[in-house]
Amino acid sequence: QINVELKKLASQLLLSLRKYFEPVLFGSIGVLSFAPFSFKYALVVSYTYLIYKLFRSNDNRNLNNLFLWSFGYWAIGTSWIIVSIYYYGNVSLFGSILLFLILSIGCIIFFFLPILLLKRVIINKSNNLLLFVPFILILVEFGRYYFLGGFPWLLPGYIFLDTPYEILYGLIGVSGLSLLLYIFVASNVVLYSNKTYLLAFNIF
């Protein structure tokens, strides 16, 4: 009887850990798409997971999933800031970590929480995921430009460097290519939701 209870407790613990660790993991692997790793599909997987969890999953923990995914994305993607502040800003290690955490939390609050607001305002009035999700994400990206004076890190459009699509930079810019990626991952979610277990066209 004791062994059965311990197994149940261990199973519940693992399930709880997965609920918190999974969004962080999928957020952090998106960073692998950028230099020096340049594993392009990592960001596709990362954003496909995020959009599915927020707009198609029956999981009601939207705020939790969004916060943890965003923390994984920003904490890993901008962690180099700690080193820069510590070595070149004459700030203590504790101060560097504190400033990094403030930046990460600021990015999450001001550029990812609006996704939930826009979801309630727009998506609840229309089920056209393919049309509205890319619109929401590109709107958030423009907000990043405006509020942080062109904050250049972790923009999805940059992953098209060294691909056949880089010729489009001169035509539609980084934001245009970000929009292309958002449309692609939204297509993935639509196909998966319709039980079509074949990801959308090969973009790279």
Name what the model sees in each region.
Residues 1-4:
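Short, Lys/Arg-enriched N-terminal segments with co-localized hydrophobic residues
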Residues 6-204:
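Membrane-embedded alpha-helical bundles of multi-pass enzymes
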